[in-house]
């Protein structure tokens, strides 16, 4: 399911047998219709960014619901897929903040300790938030609670009202929160543009004696 250390830590914050409930939900969802991302990528964020290496969290809401977009990492799409509007705005802010990045696949961020997590890990094709409130929120809230327990600092990047509600789980004074409106076209001009989350994150990490993220990689 997830990287083994993640698995054990997350489990401690969930009701008994919750993993079984998740597997049952996935069996039914994928058997009954088209669901994104592909099932083998549902837990990709936790598989490619081990707990012990996680130093940044970028929290999304749910996967992209169009064909071939979702790959299990928040805001990221495969290289050959056109960037959706929110990702276009993220890359625009990155260009203004640090420099231009031409590719849409954010896997290289994940491999540097940036956990690209969605609050819901699946979505029915064409139905934004179609799986919201059914199974995922206790699981992904548990991920945030696990990160809150880390001794080493984590930078939590929270974009939009939904993500910012998760501040309630971030109580460890060692950690840092960067928040702004969401990068979607509806809210990007209300404070996302100009918020400089990437340079601010690196400044925090370097002040803590940690290596910054190569956001342009």
Curated annotation (Swiss-Prot):
Molecular functions (GO terms): uracil DNA N-glycosylase activity
Primary site of residence: cytoplasm
A Pfam family assignment: UDG
EC numbers, comma separated: 3.2.2.27
Function statement: Excises uracil residues from the DNA which can arise as a result of misincorporation of dUMP residues by DNA polymerase or due to deamination of cytosine.
NCBIfam families assigned to the protein according to its UniProt record, in alphabetical order: PRK05254.1-1, PRK05254.1-2, PRK05254.1-5, ung
Protein name in the entry: Uracil-DNA glycosylase
Organism listed in the record: Streptococcus pyogenes serotype M1
